[in-house]
Each structure stands twice: as C-alpha cells, then as structure tokens.
Amino acid sequence: MRKISDTIARLAAMRAQQNTYIPTHGLSDRLSTLTDFGSNPGALRARCYLSDTLPEGAPLVVVLHGCTQDAAGYDFHAGWSQLADEAGFALLYPEQQRANNANLCFNWFLPGDIARARGEALSIRQMIESMVATHGLDRKRIYVTGLSAGGAMAAVMLATYPEVFAGGGIIAGLPFGSAATVPEAFDRMRGHGGPCKQALQQLVQRASTHTGPWPKVSIWQGSADHTVAASNAEAIAAQWRGVHGLGLDQAPTHSTSERGLTRQVWCDMSGVPKIEVNMIAGMGHGTPLGGDGLGAPGPYMLDVGISSTRGIARFWGIAKTDDKGASAQSRPASPIGKRLPSLAPTPSLELAKTRTAEPSRAGLEGSHAQGLKKVIEDALRAAGLMR
C-alpha cells in the first residue's frame, strides 16, 4: 500500500488535470434508447444501434465508455457504428448515470456492482438479453469492449458471465477482482501490488460456475499511460492465460513489432488465437484510433494510426482481415499522448459513488483500517474530488 503522503500528492496532481464531463453537443448521435429491459439494479441507461440492413442472426457488440464520457460521444469518436454498418453487427451501449458515479465511471471495483446477478453487471446482462431476444441476434457471437473504467467493467462482464461472451476487448483496463477498496484501486491503477497471477486466475474461475469454453480476449494499452499503468495489460493477459490453460508465465505463441505496435498472441493447442496484447509505444491514456476512416480523435480518443476498433473486431472474427487498421499504418504515438489530456480514472471518476456502497472486505474492518479509509476520503474531499 502507498504512503498517505504519496496518495495526497497524486490527488493534487489529479485535481490539476480538471477532469470534467466531455459534452457531445453538436456530435452526431446515431444511437437509440433501449427501455424496459429488466429490473436494472445498477440504474444504468441503455443505448443501442441497429442498421437498416442488419442481417438475421447478427453478432452483438457491447461497448462501455470511459470516465466523463457518454455512449453517443464514445460511438462518434471510436467509430463502432460505422464499422457495424460495414460488417453487419448490432451495438449495445450501457451508459452510466451521475446518480451512480459523479464522473460517469462504471463502478468497476465495488463488490455490489461486479458480482454475477448484482448491480451494474446484472443491468448489463439484462440489456444483452433484451437485445438478443427482441432482434434475433446470435447468442454465440456476443462480445464486450470498453475503455478505462469501461475496460475494467468489460473484464467484469467476461468474468461474471463467461458463458455469454465469445470475446472481449479491454482498452487501458484492469484485471477482474484486482481491487475492492479505495486504497487498492489507487494502487492497482498505478501498477502497485495486486493479486498474484494464480490468484487472478482463481478470481475469474470463482466468479461463476462456468468451466469453459472461455471468451477470447484482446488487450490494448499505451506504454506511456500514466493513469492506468502498462503493467495492467500483462496482469490481464496472465489472468486469462491461466483461465484458458495456456500457462500463467507462458511465452507468446508469436510476437511482432512494427512501427510502434508490439503485438503478442497466445494460441491454444489447435493454433487458435485466444489472447492478444497490443502495446503502443509512447501512447498515453485513451482509445487508439487509426487512419482508416473510423471515428474521430478527441479527448482520450487518440489518433495514433492504429485502429483498436477495427483491430478488436478483426480479432473476434466479425470484421474483414484485409483492413486499413494494420500496424503498418501506424504513426508515432507520443505526440498525441502529450497533446491530449489523460483520461484519469481519479478518485472522483472511479471511486466516488453517491449511492450507498457495499460493505468492504474484511481487510478494511477494524478501527485502524476504518481510520485509514477516513484519512483517504478526507484527502479526496480536500482535493475537491469527492463529495
């Protein structure tokens, strides 16, 4: 655990970044609102997109926005609905509400929101069921992706409902179950501490009664991300290598490095890719975009010449392989990372929650732990990052 002085210093730096809501005024909103999808215990909003030419039995892609973002803005910048028109799949965008989190982050580490059949995870599952049942979508081709808090929540969905998903795409996210308290969340984002690789594997295996097959996972990360440390990408990969039985410390089946993109792939015994890590040199915190006509750059949506949208869909097998999003199109990432602000899942973004939180784990029980929690919460309020 970091020292209190270290935590307070980081709070001051985060305060200076002035993370505020990213408005979508003037942006094209291609999404419709999905209503009456279930009991919605997580109190989330649901948006969706279905093209007029959507084929019968089409795949479904669930997209989870990052902190300070909303569904329409993320779709505009990431270009998922453009690719949906091209490749023929439906889209579901769960959307966070301020009553749940002051800065519109999915609550990726709170026990009451990340367990099967509870909170935000159950709300998203209900949305998926409504979409599939209403529109006749393919239950064997359901995928989930997200950025930052959305990436961490995508990991939650893959772990808690593995039988639902054929694949996932985690961008600047964190391993499932790696944090359950405010101090732990701080540390994991910075790359400090966390469960060992075997424990990470067990967290997924214990999140449901599912025993396989498991979803394939595409992981994307910037090497210069100072919000979610790059070491989280390897932790996510190790978590899913263990689940897939590929070996916790197994070297990749093959690896390539070209013009700023290092791609590592782990395949099963049949040679089928199950896990990939895409590390982009010099890129900060955000979703990588390419020069392939999908989406548009903006805050935390970084034009580095590599389309993660197309790359993830290609890895899942729902987009053409002869696309323009290959690494050969890439440009140096560091200027973009420097020019655009980092989307920091700060305490105000990831950790502040206005509805009553679930009781924390035993590690925070007792007077000393409660005192430490109070000190950190006081520091958050002093920095203007928590109510």
Q: Where are the model-predicted features located?
A:
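A domain-start/cap signature at the N-terminus of enzymes
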Residues: 1-60, 72-78, 139, 145-149, ...
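Short substrate-entry loop that stabilizes the transition state in hydrolases
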Residues: 54-102, 178
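Hydrolase active-site cap/lid region
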Residues: 152-199, 215, 226-237
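Short beta-strand/loop motif that positions the catalytic acidic residue
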Residues: 219-221, 225
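The conserved beta1-alpha1 loop
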Residues: 62-68, 172, 221, 281
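Alpha/beta-hydrolase active-site loop
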Residues: 112-135, 156
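Cap/lid segment of the alpha/beta-hydrolase catalytic domain
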Residues: 95-119, 182
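Short beta-strand immediately N-terminal to the catalytic nucleophile in serine-hydrolase-like folds
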Residues: 144-146, 171, 220
